[in-house]
Structure formats: C-alpha cells, structure tokens
Amino acid sequence: MPNDSFTGRDVIVFGANGALGHGVAEAFADAGASVTGVGRSQPHADRKLPGVSYVTADVTDDGELAALFADVAAPWAVINTVGGFAPYRPFARLDPAELTSQLNDNLISAALITKHALAALTSAGAGRLVHTASRAGVVSKGSGFAYSVSKLGVLHLVSMAADEVRGTRVTVNCVVPSIIDTPANRAALPNSDHGSWPKVPDIARSYLYLAAPESDLVNGAAIPV
C-alpha cells in the first residue's frame, strides 16, 4: 500500500494511548492521514506523536462521544482499539463487577462508537469503521469468561453493523489479535516466546488495509493476526 494512501483523509483512532492504538495512530499518520487520537486522558508528552491531534473522551458515555464527533472533522475512517482485559477464573469465582467492567470496556464502548461513527460515515457518503476483537472471542479455552464474552459481542456487533451498511460505500470490519507483543504482555508472561508474538507495526497494517479506499468490497470481515 502506498505510504501516502491516506493523504487528505481524516482518521479517528480510539484508544490511541495504548500500545496498539499508539502504533495504529502512527501507521495512519505515516500514511498521510490527519489523525485524531482519542484517549481517556492526554498521553504523556513523550508518547505524543507528531501529526496526531489528541482529545479526551469516555467511550462509554454517549454524550461525550456525540460531542466528540460534532467537534472533529468528518472522518474517512474510525478505528477502535479500545479494550480491557480480565484473566481466566472458574465460574465459581465469577466477579459481577469484573463482568460489568469488561462489557463496558469492550462491548458497550464498541457499540457506542459504532452508533456515532456510522452516523458520521453514512452522512459523508463513504468511509470505514474498524474494530478490534480478540481470538478469545472465538476460542474460549483458557480465556476469562468476562473478557471472552465481551469480545464475542464485538464480533457479532461487526457482523450486524456490516449487514446494516451493505450496499453503501461504508464498510465495517474488525481485526482479531491473539497475543500482541507489548511491554505489558511481556511483563505478564515473562517465560513466553516473545519473539513469536505479532508485533504492533505488523498488526497495524491490517487496519490500514481495512480502512483503505481500495478495500470497498471488504465488509463484515474478521481478520485474525
């Protein structure tokens, strides 16, 4: 894909403060996009990327998202890398607060982003919405229920939203990571083979592909990485 394939296009990256979101925002900026990075708070100065404008919003707050989309330039693409994680625990130890938190962080956030993104993209006549699911939503073994079911919900959301926009110039897809090579994951799993883990820059290329103008026939896809 040409390095300037997003020149003149506005892209919103939700979760831009996280390891994945930071890398995805950087990839779009490098490809020529005008990027708005959204986080719950402003990133530290040394994490701010040149060419990325940073704003704050609570992605589980419908009103804050409405205000954000009203304030930013009409986007070509909306990228959602927001997410929380909860480890495996047996059902006998299911924590209702953890379940609620995971549904809020992963599914409610994705649903509200979809609501406002599709309104903006359909109003513009074309565009791309790309979510982030997880292999845990497909393969439940070894996954925490709260996390797994919330990511399964994201996969179903993408399928339903894609059906809704089918036949238009708007598409809805998702990237489905397994493990990602991040400092936090390395710290959590110090004895794993980190060299075999997918790297953020490589995963970011999947978002570029799904958000590209040339990917107009790709709708409802879940790309495993």
Write out the residue ranges for each language-model feature:
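Alpha-helical segment proximal to the catalytic Tyr-Lys
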Residues: A119, A162-E164
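Rossmann-fold scaffold of SDR-type NAD(P)-dependent oxidoreductases
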Residues: F14, P75-G83, N106, H131, ...
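Active-site helix of classical SDR
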Residues: T114, S150
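C-terminal helical subdomain
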Residues: G167-V170, C174-V175, T182, N191-V225
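Conserved mid-core segment of classical short-chain dehydrogenase/reductases
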Residues: G83-T100, S143-A146, R186
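Catalytic Tyr-X3-Lys loop
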Residues: A92-A111, V130, V154
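N-terminal Rossmann NAD(P)H-binding glycine-rich loop of SDR-like oxidoreductase domains
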Residues: N17, A25
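Residue(s) in the substrate-gating loop at a strand-loop-helix junction
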Residues: S134
